[in-house]
Amino acid sequence: DEVVALCLNTTQDVFLARVFRVQSMLQRRYPKQIRFGYAWAEGLFSGEKLVKEARAIMLCDQLEVAGSSPVPHEPVRRGTDVKTQEGLERFVVFFQPKVDMRSGKTVGAEALVRGVDRRGLIVPPSHFMEHMESSGAIRNLDLFVLDSTLAAMERWRRKGLQLLPISVNFSRFTLFSPSSPGAVLAILSRYPYISSTLLELEISESALDVETGSLIRAMDFFRPFGLSFSLDDFGCRYSNLSLFTSVAFDTIKLDRSLVKDIITNAMSLELVEDIIGLCSTRKMSCIAEGVENQAQVDALLNVGGMYAQGFYYARPIPMMEFEQNHLIRSITGKPEMRPADQKTEGD
């Protein structure tokens, strides 16, 4: 059973104090039996969105009730219900390059998770993502991708390769889980030689269906770590328009549905041009997703577009292939050495 309680005409401090008091009482009386979520809004609000936000936190709380850990490799070891259902053995991270259309050079990448079945075949996320979101296990998968990305960047650093910015997708379950900032900070601390400014949290569409104030507060927990944010699938829904004006994203990713029609639909091209102009005014990067041909590239360049991602340039590829084809040596051409790697006389 699920019970929803609504607290009206109170301040945020009083509300949170009540929440934590009730949560503590329930955990003492019914240890590991009660799942608990909450959400706060000020001024006008949508009850449906608040319940969705609270339920997302509750599903994350379910994992802790069940005794799981926020360790980033957890989905690989413990996601047995998902793996058994979909026939998966493990998860791997692929990278899809982001390209400067003016020069054709790779300027970054998006980290994307894939499953591997018992035959060693790659399984797309559409086969398992919905189940992981409904079970709340998506948070551990997001953290696994973040940790795997940082581990890859550390390997590249030690090889003397030039590091590029990488974006990692975060679902609403991960973004709104109270324990996520601590888990992210713990992961970042394991890679002290990788600048957090090279990482971008890409907010998936599912995270957008919440109160704007709640979204801003959730993002503010991660900003002190040096992380930036991108708004994914911009233009696919009307609700994104209000987010564009009220939330300080660092990057806007144009939805593929907008890019697909820019050759045949003059209005789509004008809309894309306006969005690119707004991004430039607000000092945001703008990336066109789903670019599939040279005609789209030419059209985007003509209206001020600079960056793109899509099959025309590259499909999502394994880490090693990305390293070999899209990374170059640093200026020195020599790997940097950590203090732990350096030897002194007598060692």
What are these regions (language model features)?
Residues 2-42, 185:
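GGDEF/GGEEF active-site signature
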Residues 18-33, 152-158, 188-190, 327-330:
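Short catalytic/binding micro-motifs of nucleotide second-messenger systems
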Residues 23, 153, 157, 216-224, ...:
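Surface-exposed amphipathic alpha-helices with a cationic face
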Residues 27-35, 48-76, 81-92, 119, ...:
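Catalytic/regulatory signature loops of cyclic-dinucleotide turnover enzymes
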Residues 30-35, 91, 109, 164-166, ...:
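PAS and PAS-like sensory/regulatory domains
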Residues 40-44, 105-107, 137-215, 290:
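Catalytic core of bacterial c-di-GMP phosphodiesterases, primarily the EAL and HD-GYP domains
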Residues 51-55, 59, 66-71, 101-105, ...:
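EAL-family c-di-GMP phosphodiesterase catalytic domain
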Residues 90-130, 149, 250:
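A short, well-structured catalytic beta-strand-centered motif of the EAL phosphodiesterase domain
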